[in-house]
UniProtKB/Swiss-Prot annotation:
Ranges that cross the membrane: none
Entry note: cofactor: Binds 2 magnesium ions per tetramer.
The family this protein is said to belong to: Belongs to the class-II aminoacyl-tRNA synthetase family. Phe-tRNA synthetase alpha subunit type 1 subfamily.
Binding site for Mg(2+): E255
Cofactor(s) needed for function: Mg(2+)
One BP annotation, GO: phenylalanyl-tRNA aminoacylation
Name of this protein: Phenylalanine--tRNA ligase alpha subunit
GO cellular component: a single term: cytoplasm
Lineage, highest ranks first: Bacteria, Pseudomonadati, Gemmatimonadota, Gemmatimonadia, Gemmatimonadales
Quaternary structure annotation from Swiss-Prot or TrEMBL: Tetramer of two alpha and two beta subunits.
Catalytic activity: tRNA(Phe) + L-phenylalanine + ATP = L-phenylalanyl-tRNA(Phe) + AMP + diphosphate + H(+)
Keywords carried by this UniProt record: Aminoacyl-tRNA synthetase, ATP-binding, Cytoplasm, Ligase, Magnesium, Metal-binding, Nucleotide-binding, Protein biosynthesis
Its EC number(s): 6.1.1.20
MF GO annotations: ATP binding; magnesium ion binding; phenylalanine-tRNA ligase activity; tRNA binding
């Protein structure tokens, strides 16, 4: 390639770039315009740059000037296109025949909705909200709650330890002891919070999930009070016509221990069935003593429930993983 051919190719490329940009509608997005321009010029610019080095030394000065002028000309054409767009943007064009766009509505997560509703019910029953740390000591998480030293829940395969004596709490029950240490009875608290287990993520288990803990401690508190309060909660949450039942269960920090079942419809066409929604019982005297209170004077009851599982029973969900998938198609159903 000689100098005259080089200059002719540079002029031709400049003309084609100007023609391309001049022919684009101002409604064309700038990134689209740049994409079309790059497709036209990039390979040819690279070829001209390579050819520059092959020209005789006496021609390179003129060819180099032409190459720089070419790049400036292309940039000027692109700037002119942008200015045309800016000038046109001041004119608002509305197509009244276009369908309206839907409005995205934010919503609370179904588990949060359940926690808020349960919390409001217990507030109306005289409970206040209490919180505790998610990183706990082994004593608050196990020892103060009457877990024997060789209890399997304390093993590494069940609990996530942060250090020799610190761990991610496996339940919200430590809030019981911390609350009783801080406040004198009568105490009625509801403790929502995140808990952690070394569980596999499957249809019914999650390694991190929310839990709700309830505690009532005073003089003369009995199992009758526990049953009456939880039955009233179920009536308000599930409806006055739903039946509840209590059965025996075991937890180290209560004695006696029980579980409460409620008749619910899981939405699978099989009608009402009994579903366990919480564990409960009378606070073990050792727990009351660990909090620094006299177990001969004070008694109490406690319960714990998983709002995710309650949300599943409320909304007919059979796989807990759906609650954690962040699928907008699922979550937008709960927008109010």
């Amino acid at each position: 390639m000689n100098l005259s051919e080089y200059l002719a190719q540079a002029d031709a490329l400049a003309a084609e770039c100007h023609a391309l940009l001049a022919g684009l509608d101002v409604a064309t997005r700038l990134d689209v315009a740049k994409g079309q321009l790059n497709a036209l010029k990039d390979d040819r610019l690279n070829a001209l740059q390579s050819a520059l080095r092959m020209l005789p030394a006496e021609d390179r000065r003129a060819a180099g000037g032409a190459f720089n002028t070419l790049k400036q000309s292309i940039q000027a054409a692109l700037d002119a296109f942008g200015q045309r767009q800016s000038a046109a943007s001041g004119v608002v064009q509305v197509d009244a025949t276009m369908p309206a766009r839907g409005i995205w509505r934010g919503s609370l997560h179904p588990v949060t909705l359940v926690i808020d509703e349960i919390s409001e019910i217990f507030r109306e029953l005289g409970f206040t909200i209490a919180l505790g740390p998610e990183a706990e000591t082994e004593w608050y998480n196990f020892g103060a709650l009457n877990f024997p030293p060789d209890h399997p829940a304390m093993e590494l395969h069940d609990t996530l330890y942060l250090g020799e004596d610190t761990l991610l709490r496996t339940h919200t029950s430590p809030v019981q002891v911390r609350t009783l240490q801080r406040y004198a009875p009568p105490v009625r608290v509801l403790a929502p919070g995140q808990v952690y287990r070394r569980d596999f993520f499957d249809a019914t288990h999650a390694p991190a999930f929310m839990q709700l803990e309830g505690l009532a401690v005073d003089e003369g508190v009995s199992f009758v009070d526990l049953k009456a309060t939880l039955a009233e909660f179920a009536r308000r949450f599930y409806g006055a016509t739903r039946r509840v039942r209590f059965g025996p269960s075991y937890f180290p920090f209560v004695e006696p221990g029980a579980q409460m079942d409620v008749e619910v419809d899981l939405g699978d066409g099989k009608g009402l069935r009994w579903v366990e929604i919480l564990g409960c019982g009378m606070v073990h005297p050792n727990v009351i003593e660990a909090a620094g209170l006299d177990s001969e004077k004070y008694t109490g009851w406690a319960f714990g429930m998983g709002p995710a599982r309650i949300a599943m029973s409320r909304y007919g969900i059979n796989d807990i993983r759906v609650l954690y998938d962040s699928d907008v198609r699922f979550l937008e159903q709960f927008a109010r």
